Amino acid sequence: MTTMAEGTGAPARRVAWVTGASRGVGRGIASALGAAGWAVYVTARSSAAGRTGHLPGTVEEAAAAVSAAGGQGAGIVCDHADDAAVAAVARRIRAEQGRLDLLVNNVWGGYERINAGLWEESRLPLWEQPLEVFDAMFTRGVRAHYVALAVCAPMLISTPASLVVTVSNAVSAGGDGGAYAMAKLADDRLALTAALQLKEHKVASVAVHPGWVRTEGVMQFAEYIDLSQSQSPEGVGRAVAALAGDPDVLSLTGQALAVDALAARYGIDVTT
């Protein structure tokens, strides 16, 4: 990955890091940023050398999709439960790019049992669900987002008009949701705390709330879900790319933004 468009003398591309981007929403966001001309680092555990489960998608494929869309992609295998590995990615981005315009906190744990076919288990009351579900959602979800933000904050502060997007969900606002709702509420709070602390540095921080998204994992259980108003991973990506390109994004800092609201704000289709 270079910082200049080859042979054009064009200004350096804007730089993003999308965590948990081998598939699903993360890959959709990375691809949309590529289509907008960004340089995008994608991280996840699944790689050509070995997948974490049966679902398709690797960091190499996601990076190639970024480049095919018109951006510059770099895939890095990273276990986001490993703080040293996360910090190493941040150091690499600083060394290669010298800037970070956008951090997308998307990596997520806790679906491993669902992806293994245990959909009904996810509907059980919290006292009947395995404790490992809670641990995974907070370790490879909330804590992973906290760590990525912590190691990237100095780079974000030194990059003008940078942005942090934490992918969350409206279930945090109330209703049933068990460990998932608790984790998403914590993510919303992380986005708000970052907004309050980073605003003086002109860094925006928001939570983004997709609806039902037709990811590889969700489509395994399409028979159980009403997907008539669902979004595509690429559609969510277009919403995030539009947000990242908004010169007035700092006015939105601290908010939890529904993808449908972003679609209306920017006049984009998030369903296809």
Please annotate each region the language model reported.
Residues 8-47:
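Canonical Rossmann dinucleotide-binding motif of NAD(H)/NADP(H)-dependent dehydrogenases/reductases
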Residues 11-12, 69-72, 92-105, 110-112:
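A glycine-rich helix->loop->beta "capping" turn
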Residues 13-14, 71-72, 99-100, 155-169, ...:
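Active-site loop of short-chain dehydrogenase/reductase
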Residues 149-150, 192:
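A short, exposed helix-loop element centered on a Lys and neighboring polar residues
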Residues 207, 223-272:
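C-terminal helical subdomain
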Residues 109-116, 120-133, 137-138, 157-200, ...:
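Catalytic loop of short-chain dehydrogenase/reductase
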Residues 56-57, 77-90, 131:
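The beta1-alpha1 cofactor-binding region of Rossmann-like NAD(H)/NADP(H)-dependent oxidoreductases
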